Amino acid sequence: MGCWVENLWGFAPNALAWVDPLGLYGYYELYKNGKLVYRGITERKVIERIMEHAGDCKDFDDARYIEGLKNYRAARDMEGSGLWHDWDTDKNKDMLNKKRKIVKGYYHSYHKDKFTNNKDKDGRTFLTKKQISDRMKNATPLTQSEKKQG
């Protein structure tokens, strides 16, 4: 996907096109040559967020996404758990997500001792690699025309 920026700001002629009025969230994964390079969530239409990444010069050539997740936590569980698995191995040094310091605002999402399925902890639900992979089996891939737009 190329990088062409004509306008660094924008006006939303239809605000509902940028934000889901039902409050649903989406989760997406970006790929380069078949390798996962980015995980993200959004409360807007996922395809528009993916196109923003293309405009921001993120280096990817494919994407898969799930829309209509019931809330922020459901989307964040997938993103946070996935990133924890990614960053726990040296083979994923090329991930485009920013690694974050262990600070209060993010600690509960990435540290295995703070997940809700860890007895007596209050935090997010930690998903296994298999659980994430199983959910992504039904994810929507980018169409050829969407790939050309980016």
What are these regions (language model features)?
Residues 1-25:
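Short turn/helix-capping motifs enriched in Asx and small/polar residues
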